């Protein structure tokens, strides 16, 4: 069981400007990126053949240990590693043209976990049938992003929404054929409540994971095992589907994502 806390975004950053920290001739700016962000921002594939050596004096395993020591110090419990990569320092000039790229350090992303399994970080702010609502809501994600180089941690950002209490309990879930039988009933009913513009929806991904649900009392929540049926136009960005339905893995009922998000966001 989880109780809502006062969500506060926190950060640990270098006081020194990155260009002063890592100066380079002909460069005006420098920005550190994870591999995914580097590819997204530059439109360039990262080193696929691992021919570029990471200049960090720590191995990736040593760096991860230091990242997890930091998480322990800030009281981050029940988290799991979601992603890790080399750290790319992209140097640009005054015209925003790339001057150079150095690979030095690592980027780690952790998220809330249940029994050491990361919970879903899938967002519904691009889901077509939920964009018609009057107010903007989305499911908050407890994410911890840490970057480090040979000098240690240089940047960290995180936000806590929930405080865990008690022990997790086992849940009996439906077999997948049983779930599909229930889904044939519950998904059409869901789309009557939140209609979409399509005559038919072809989901292209199905995932068994944990998802946040509302508890019995105000401010009380729990992570349940669920099946997420989703359709994603951009398969390189699966956390932002265009259609998405969350089914309770125990009984096949649809979890109202918007209702849960509103309750988490309530003062």
Regions found by a protein language model. Name each.
Residues 1-136, 262-266:
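Preferential activation on post-signal-peptide N-terminal prodomains/segments
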Residues 220-223, 232-267:
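C-terminal soluble interaction/assembly domains
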Residues 103-105, 139-141, 222-226, 240:
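A general secondary-structure signal for short beta-strands and their flanking turns/coil
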Residues 136-223:
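Charged, low-complexity helical/coil segments in non-catalytic cytosolic or luminal regions
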Residues 114-116, 152, 162, 235, ...:
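Short loop/turn segments at secondary-structure transitions that flank enzyme active sites
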Residues 111-116, 208-211, 230-234:
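Generic short beta-strand segments
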Residues 118-139, 192-197, 233-240:
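Intrinsically disordered, low-complexity coil segments
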Residues 67, 146, 227-233, 252:
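Conserved histidines in hydrophobic membrane contexts and catalytic metal-binding motifs
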